[in-house]
Amino acid sequence: MAADKIDTIVSLSKRRGFVFPCSEIYGGQRAAWDYGPLGVELKENLKRQWWRYMVTSREDVVGLDSSVILAPEVWVASGHVATFTDPLTECTSCHKRFRADHLEEAYEEKKGHAPENGLADLNCPNCGNKGTFTEPKQFSGLLSTHLGPTQDSGSVAYLRPETAQGIFTNFAQVQTTSRRKPPFGIAQMGKSFRNEITPGNFIFRTREFEQMEMEFFVKPGEDEKWQEYWMEQRWNWYTGLGLREENMRWYEHPAEKLSHYSKRTADIEYRFSFGGSEWGELEGVANRTDYDLSSHAKASGQDLSYYDQEAQERWTPYVIEPAAGVGRAMLAFLLDAYIEDEAPNAKGKLEKRTVLRLDPRLSPVKVAVLPLSRNPELSPKAKGLAQALRQNWNIEFDDAGAIGRRYRRQDEIGTPFCVTVDFDTLDDNAVTVRERDTMKQERVSLDQIEGYLASRLVGC
């Protein structure tokens, strides 16, 4: 995968309405992005597929939507106030700030070994000078705010850095009201916030992001087999939606780099091919043990254990957590789907064609309805067909420009099918359906078109 592919995706995203720079009319906000008409559809399709796979297609997982701002005591008990920090270093030459661990990891990935003298061996990625980094200091990743009319220590609150803690604090209520018993899971999607030192790489690392997390509660001693199970499930979800396995790998966190709550964490990494780093974390599957439930039980004085009626014993569940970022998943699917091939134009000459070979379940637009030309007879018929199909799918109507150019526009945004209403339609009540990847065309009767598309858009 070429290193400049990210730049191509950034350009395509802005030009076609997937992702825009935030507050661009004011010069932009660093590492903040707004999702345009196509981007929000792709993002919602991703979330819908995750929810269907992780929640509604299973009997052992239920959903939750907890608050973004939790009681500050939650973050003290969870360990985030004390330990949710990153090592911050500054280049004394250009005064750019970086995460020290990211600099060392990039060096190790490139050289195959850690720097012998730490930061002293590293060149600044910004100015190129060597040995100019300050001694790292711990920098809090929590974003804080104040609630109420006064701004003092008693009004401090935190924007959640993960959705997980809202699940843990609601564990007992969800378990009781849903009448579930371990092993079972609680899933949640929502916005989280982290005061990143070095956000960047488009939508990969941002201070405001959306998560898809599930906490799966199991009996202690059964946690390791369940972690293996969820690692396989999460890998299969990505490949099932089209990610190629040659662009994916597992990364096991070494013991010294595990989070404060983790017994074991394995990341699915994707070949993003960022400048200076080929691989990046796509999703983590962590064994959080009973750390969170035990910590909150101790701090709150509430019982968060589970009484096992069959074994007649009480225990605190261990937790397996698959945690994914919506933005990272979207970026991976865009990169993997993007191809350039050749297709004949109206004169039969081969021209470059840009295609997003997205799985139809993810495609922002499922079907484009295209009248062959702007015509008082064709346009109303095409608009009527588009409106009828909108009852089932997201449909785009386009009658501007040559038909070949309109096909290319749809290929570029990943639309799986184009339906052309032509002059023959007025006589035979049939339309031409063009498939995106093969460009094959098939004549389909109007009274069968809905069933034809439905059989090819299963799960959409």
From Swiss-Prot:
InterPro entries: aa-tRNA-synt_IIb, aa-tRNA-synth_II, aa-tRNA-synth_II/BPL/LPL, Anticodon-bd, Anticodon-bd_dom_sf, Gly-tRNA_synthase/POLG2, Gly_tRNA_ligase_bac, GlyRS-like_core. It catalyses: tRNA(Gly) + glycine + ATP = glycyl-tRNA(Gly) + AMP + diphosphate. GO terms for biological process: glycyl-tRNA aminoacylation. One of its GO terms (molecular function) is glycine-tRNA ligase activity. It is found in: Cytoplasm. SUPFAM superfamilies: Class II aaRS ABD-related, Class II aaRS and biotin synthetases. This is Glycine--tRNA ligase. Homodimer. It comes from Streptomyces coelicolor (strain ATCC BAA-471 / A3(2) / M145). It is an enzyme of class 6 (ligase).
